[in-house]
C-alpha cells in the first residue's frame, strides 16, 4: 500500500517531521506502523489501534500519539495529521486540521 504523507506547499513532510520529534521508543513504533501498512496494506489496520473519527477520517493511536488518515482505496492511504493525544477524544482543532488537509488533496471525508 502507498502511504501519502501530508506535505506543505514548500514540500515539508509534516508527518515524518512529527515522527522524528518523538522519543526513540515512540518513533520506532511509528515507523513499525508505517512498515506494517506498506507491506500488509489494509489488513494491517485491523491489527492496529484504530478508530473512526468522522466519515472517512480515521485515526491510528500509539502510545500518546495519533495519526489521522483517510483510506483512499485498497492501494492508497493519506496520513493527514499527527499529534499528541491530549484527551480521550480527538480535540476539535486537531480534527479541523485533518479535515482541511483532506480537502487540500481533494478528498471528501463525508
What does each of the following model-derived ranges do?
Residues 80:
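Conserved catalytic cores of phosphodiester-cleaving nucleases, focusing on short active-site segments
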Residues 67-70:
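Short, surface-exposed beta-strand/loop micro-motifs that present aromatic residues
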Residues 1-64, 74-76, 84-110:
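Basic, Lys/Arg-enriched alpha-helical interface segments
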Amino acid at each position: 500500500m502507498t502511504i501519502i504523507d501530508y506535505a506543505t506547499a514548500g514540500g515539508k513532510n509534516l508527518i515524518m517531521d512529527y515522527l522524528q520529534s518523538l522519543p526513540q521508543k515512540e518513533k520506532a513504533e511509528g515507523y513499525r506502523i508505517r512498515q506494517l501498512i506498506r507491506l500488509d496494506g489494509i489488513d494491517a489496520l485491523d491489527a492496529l489501534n484504530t478508530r473512526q473519527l468522522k466519515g472517512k477520517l480515521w485515526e491510528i493511536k500509539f502510545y500518546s500519539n495519533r495519526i489521522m488518515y483517510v483510506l483512499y482505496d485498497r492501494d492508497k492511504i493519506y496520513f493527514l495529521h499527527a499529534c499528541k493525544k491530549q484527551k480521550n477524544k480527538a480535540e476539535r482543532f486537531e480534527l479541523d486540521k485533518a479535515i482541511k488537509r483532506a480537502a487540500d488533496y481533494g478528498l471528501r471525508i463525508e
